[in-house]
């Protein structure tokens, strides 16, 4: 399978955006409560796909695994750009 010069569209359902945001908040809190650095752990999970970066505490691991990592990245980028004044 090769790459193409054509731009591919990627779309995330609007309902999933809120659910992903809520999940990330819950996972962040669970990581913090267990004494981990939540940002480092979430980045580790997103980059590697290894669920061991997220504890089972408060069902955080199962919650974050409901979503594909590219969906999580899309929500993070959207949130960042919106928070920095980009009109989305």
Curated annotation (Swiss-Prot):
One Pfam family this sequence matches: IreB
Signal peptide: none
Stored InterPro entries: IreB (IPR009309)
Family, per entry: Belongs to the UPF0297 family.
Protein name: UPF0297 protein stu1959
